[in-house]
Every structure is written in structure tokens, then in C-alpha cells.
A protein has these predicted regions:
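Residues in the short beta-alpha loop(s) of Rossmann-like NAD(P)-binding domains
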Residues: 6-10
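C-terminal catalytic/substrate-binding lobe primarily of soluble NAD(P)-dependent oxidoreductases
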Residues: 135-396
Length: 396
């Protein structure tokens, strides 16, 4: 098995050399991606896309046409796509980008396996939701039978009266040195976080909701499982909970799982929606990143030149990430990963707690895709949750 790394900048060069992986700095653009990738990608190959500002939709179609498998951790447009005002906010939202991928699912129903969003969240969060529902079913309904279809899963969530699903995350990792003035730090991709934090806030919108946000907007196309607000997610706070932190205020950052999970667990009678849970991300990053966000917002959303991913500098803390299922008979139930920096370093080199959770989700998705190479375009919710967790759990 041959591994090649194609990247837009030299970060990660030393790690690639350590593992004997060929490392090439060649940024992909709308103009050159076919020319660059055609010599590298053929039938049976696997393209793992962990970049930003590279169109997931274009790369997916490229791979399917060549019989190659594909996995991404989020659906990205080309550089500038998030801010292209010639396209409506609805069309360039995560909801709109997902609908473009859904169109490819219909276009290539029996193509090579493509999982456009499978890291930790989106990705593992979908499997934690399902395991959480099984556990609640055992406790509340006194049965733990695994649903056999998407419709069965949705009916189980409705029967349990789950109203809201949070992707709830609290990062308590601490680094030395910490954030400096005019520097943006984070425990994972600064560019990735800033990109999604600057996008309009998006959330799956449940049937139990009795009001509508003043700045809320509905989509006029697609599955209509989600809404968006006319302000950046990094400016919106929501209350959530994790076992170690307890209650906290997190940022309602747009994420693919908010849209796909609310869609997956929708119950319909004909064209009428009978049940759908509200679903959103509630993210409290590490405290140094919160300081970075405050500075970023205060500078009118202008990103400083200095950016740093906190990796070797982290000396304590953990990342708690999981599914918080709310509204049922038990009130609320959280199921997920509580990974400390010390555990992460014992499990895998060159990682912190956050990056290892993502890497575990990526690895599980890649293995499942290779075991099921002709499934077409799949949401994480379409992946076998038991197999995915079996693969990922040793690293969580």
C-alpha cells in the first residue's frame, strides 16, 4: 500500500518523513486539480481530503468518475466560496453544500464509496447518537434491539421523545506558552475553525420548537431539515453540558452533523414532517482559543497574521466531545469521548486530545469505506455505527 501526501504548505513535513510518506507541496485550485490528481488517482485508490478551501464536490465527482473512494471531514468550497456574495447565503451555507453532495448521491447511486463528512464531528457524533439511543431504549423502553433501517431509527428517537441533540464539546487543554497578543491559537486547524466560525450560524430545526428566531432564515430547497441565522456562529452562544465540565456556554458553530442528523431522524407521513429533533453543535474551545475569538471579533473579524496550532505546548487538560440527547423521560443523556492529553500521547504520537479524536473518526471511516467500496455517497449516519465505534474506541 502506497501513501502520498499532497499539501498546500510545508506543515507536517517532519511527521511525513518520520513515517516514510512522500510529501509534496502543491496547492490544489479550481484550475489545476484535475491535472495534479489524474496521475495519482485511479480505480480502487483512496483520496483522503483533509484540506480547506478545496471543493469537496469537485473532488468527489472526480473520484467517483475514476472509481476511487473518498473521505473528507467537512464539505468545503473553493477559496472564497463562503464569502461569494454573488451566491445566496442559503446556497453557500453548509446546508447548501450538503445538498450539492446529495445531488451527487442521486447522480451516482452505485458509485465508489464516498463519505464527505467523517472525522469526530461530523462523523463519530452520529454513531454516539445511535449508541445513546440504544442505551436510552434499554433504560426507558426496556428493550435494546438495534433498529434495522433509517425509518426505524427515526421512529425510535420519536418514541423516546428526544427533542434536542447537542454535539457538545468542551476543550480544557492548556498550553505553555499560551496565546500571545495578535495571535490566533487553537488545538486544531486555525483556518478551519475560523472559516466555520465566520459562517452564518446553522442548526437542525425540530418539530417541537414553538418560536422562530428573529434573524432566522429557512431554506427554499432540499430536505429543509435546518435553518440559519444572519450572524456568524462565533457570535452565538448556547447552553450545553458535558460530564467533566457540567453546564457551559458554547458557540453555536455551523457543522454538517447538525443538518444530517436532523434529516436522518425525520419521521414523515407522506410529505408531512411528523417528527424531527433540533440538532446543533455547542462548542467551548480551549480557553486560549476563546481569547483568540474575542480578539478576532473585536478586530471586526479580521484574522491576525500569526496563527498557531497547540500541540507539543499542551501540558494538561482534555477534550470532552459527545452527543447530548435531551427531552426524554430521563431529561438528558450524554454519550461520547473524554480524552486527556496524557492518554492521547500514549496512544499516538504527533497528536493532542482534539486531533486524535478526529484522526480516530477518519481512520474508522476509511476502513469502513474500504470494507464497503461500492456504497455511493454516504452520510456518517449511513455508516455501520457499531463497526465504526469498534474501530475508533481504542483511541478515544
Amino acid at each position: 500500500m502506497l501513501f502520498r501526501s499532497l499539501t498546500g504548505d510545508p506543515r507536517g513535513k517532519d511527521e511525513a518523513r518520520h513515517f516514510g510518506i512522500k510529501f509534496n507541496v502543491k496547492p490544489l485550485t479550481r484550475e489545476n486539480y484535475k491535472q495534479v490528481l489524474e496521475p495519482l488517482i485511479g480505480k480502487g485508490d483512496f483520496l483522503l481530503n483533509l484540506s480547506v478551501e478545496v471543493s469537496s464536490v469537485d473532488l468527489i465527482e472526480f473520484c467517483v468518475r475514476r472509481g476511487a473512494m473518498y473521505l473528507d471531514t467537512c464539505i468545503e468550497p473553493w477559496l472564497g466560496g463562503y464569502y461569494d456574495t454573488s451566491i445566496s447565503a442559503s446556497r453557500r451555507s453548509n446546508y447548501g453544500l450538503r445538498e450539492e453532495v446529495v445531488a451527487l448521491r442521486r447522480k451516482y447511486p452505485n458509485g465508489s464509496t464516498v463519505i464527505p463528512t467523517h472525522g469526530a464531528n461530523p462523523g463519530l457524533i452520529s454513531h454516539w447518537v445511535k449508541q445513546g439511543l440504544i442505551n436510552l431504549s434499554r433504560d426507558i423502553l426496556k428493550r435494546a434491539a438495534k433498529p434495522e433501517s433509517r425509518q426505524d431509527w427515526a421512529k425510535l428517537a420519536m418514541q423516546l421523545e428526544v427533542k434536542t441533540i447537542h454535539c457538545s464539546e468542551r476543550d480544557t487543554q492548556v498550553a505553555n506558552p499560551g496565546k500571545r497578543r495578535l495571535e490566533f491559537v487553537n488545538t486544531w486547524s486555525v483556518d478551519g475553525f475560523v472559516g466555520e466560525g465566520s459562517q452564518p450560524c446553522e442548526l437542525g430545526w425540530g418539530t417541537h420548537e414553538k418560536h422562530f428566531p428573529r434573524d432566522g432564515k429557512q431554506h427554499k430547497f432540499g430536505c429543509k431539515s435546518a435553518i440559519f441565522l444572519t450572524r456568524p456562529g462565533a457570535s452565538v452562544r448556547v447552553r450545553s453540558w458535558t460530564p467533566g465540565e457540567g453546564s457551559f456556554h458554547g458557540f453555536l458553530i455551523t457543522h454538517g452533523e447538525a443538518i444530517s442528523i436532523s434529516d436522518y431522524f425525520t419521521v414523515r407521513s407522506g410529505k408531512k414532517v411528523m417528527y424531527r429533533p433540533t440538532c446543533h453543535y455547542a462548542y467551548h474551545p480551549c480557553d486560549n482559543t476563546v481569547l483568540s475569538l474575542h480578539e478576532y471579533a473585536g478586530k471586526n473579524w479580521q484574522l491576525p497574521e500569526n496563527k498557531r496550532i497547540l500541540m507539543d505546548e499542551v501540558y494538561e487538560g482534555a477534550d470532552e466531545l459527545g452527543a447530548l440527547l435531551c427531552g426524554h423521560e430521563k431529561g438528558a443523556y450524554w454519550y461520547g469521548s473524554r480524552l486527556t492529553i496524557h492518554e492521547a500521547r500514549k496512544l499516538a504520537p504527533f497528536n493532542n486530545a482534539t486531533s486524535l479524536q478526529v484522526a480516530a473518526g477518519v481512520m474508522a471511516g476509511v476502513v469502513w469505506a474500504m470494507e464497503n467500496p461500492l456504497r455511493g455517497v454516504c452520510d456518517p449516519d449511513d455508516v455501520d455505527y457499531q463497526r465504526a465505534l469498534e474501530l475508533a474506541n481504542p483511541y478515544l
